[in-house]
UniProtKB/Swiss-Prot annotation:
It comes from Mediterraneibacter gnavus (strain ATCC 29149 / DSM 114966 / JCM 6515 / VPI C7-9). Pathway: Amino-sugar metabolism; N-acetylneuraminate degradation; D-fructose 6-phosphate from N-acetylneuraminate: step 1/5. Disruption phenotype: Deletion of the nan cluster abolishes the ability to grow on sialylated substrates. The fitness of the nan mutant is significantly impaired, with a reduced ability to colonize the mucus layer in monocolonized mice. One of its GO terms (cellular component) is cytosol. This is N-acetylneuraminate lyase. Induction: Induced in the presence of 2,7-anhydro-Neu5Ac or alpha2-3-sialyllactose (3'SL). One of its GO terms (biological process) is N-acetylneuraminate catabolic process. Its main location: cytoplasm. Homotetramer. PANTHER family: N-ACETYLNEURAMINATE LYASE. Gene3D superfamilies: Aldolase class I (3.20.20.70). InterPro entries: Aldolase_TIM, DapA-like, NanA. Aceneuramate binds at residues 59-60, 179, 202, 204-205, 221.
Length: 315
């Protein structure tokens, strides 16, 4: 693909991506439709907590189970609150290129900082086809940064070094959200790309490991339940206080393990926790994600209390 616009790498503003970026949760009303009020309320919550930005319409946003119109409504309501206050990365990948491009154009029109995309799912495509898919999406938002989302355990395909080399020919590509489990992948991507690109840590349970080995930002699905803890963890890492950082990471992980022990989906647990701890009304999860059952409420309450206890201990 010939790139019509050649943006200078020296003009990139990577600083706005460095820090804690919670993945934004899907917000529904009682009928299961997108709740604009819920979206704006959650955005205000993140502004208040002081996080660096938000990652919208990704896995935590249940994007796989939402329509193109749903995802537009979510992003529009995020931007009503977040513009000028938070870095906004919009995940725009759909099961086909046309819809992905539509969301990319929409996101650029709203003024997001970056768009992101997983690779095509279901069919195992050759790397040149994956590159074509990503570049076609990027071309639909020619003035917007592009983040590659590497999550092989769910997408079924991994970002290889060869594919990463090919994608760096696109001047809009600024880095990788790396959610593969080996921390070594972060080191390899960072070492290959250098200072002109940013690598985001994906797995929340290894926030500390990812940051230490080279990730300068982090995007995670549990940050929203306990942003203060991850902000403190990031602060400790930046200050070289590794013993304290490790204690906070361990505490966060225990909370994650508790949240994952319910019958219902983890995001259903998190939404219930945010209702208890923060008074947020975000609704349930969209089927086929499993909803909470009555027996899960004890787990929800325990996890909510664990977050409160950890905040008292470490903040």
């Amino acid at each position: 693909m010939a790139f019509m616009k050649q943006r200078s790498k020296t003009m990139r503003n990577l600083e706005k991506y460095k820090g804690v970026i919670p993945a934004f949760y899907a917000c529904y009303d009682k009928e299961g439709n997108i709740s604009p009020e819920g979206v704006q309320g959650l955005t205000k919550y993140f502004v208040k907590k002081g996080v660096k930005g938000v990652y919208v319409n990704g896995s935590s946003g249940e994007c796989i189970y939402q329509s193109v119109e749903d995802r537009k409504i979510v992003l529009e309501n995020v931007m009503k609150v977040a513009e000028g206050k938070l870095t906004v990365i919009a995940h725009v990948a759909c099961n086909n290129t046309k819809d992905s491009q539509e969301l990319a154009r929409h996101a650029e029109g709203l003024g997001v900082d970056a768009i992101a995309a997983i690779p095509p799912i279901y069919f195992h495509l050759p790397e040149y086809a994956i590159a074509q898919y990503w570049n076609a999406i990027s071309a639909a938002a020619p003035n917007t940064d592009f983040v590659i989302y590497n999550i092989p355990q769910l997408a079924g395909v991994a970002l290889t070094q060869n594919l990463f080399v090919e994608m760096r020919k696109n001047p809009n590509v600024i880095g990788v959200k790396n959610s593969s489990m080996p921390v070594q992948d972060i080191q390899m991507f960072k070492q290959a790309a250098g200072a002109e690109y940013i690598i985001f840590n994906g797995p929340d349970e290894q926030f500390m490991s990812g940051r230490v080995i080279g990730a300068e930002g982090a995007i995670g699905g549990t940050y929203g339940a306990m942003p203060e803890l991850y902000l403190k963890l990031d602060e400790c890492i930046n200050a070289g206080k590794m013993t304290e950082a490790r204690k906070i990471q361990y505490a966060c992980n225990e909370i994650i393990y508790k949240m994952c022990s319910a019958h219902g989906n983890m995001y259903a647990v998190i939404k219930a926790i945010l209702k208890i701890n923060e008074g947020l009304e975000l609704g349930a999860v969209r089927e086929p994600l499993p909803a909470l059952v009555d027996e899960d409420m004890e787990i929800v309450k325990e996890a909510a209390q664990m977050i409160c206890d950890a905040k008292k201990k470490f903040l």
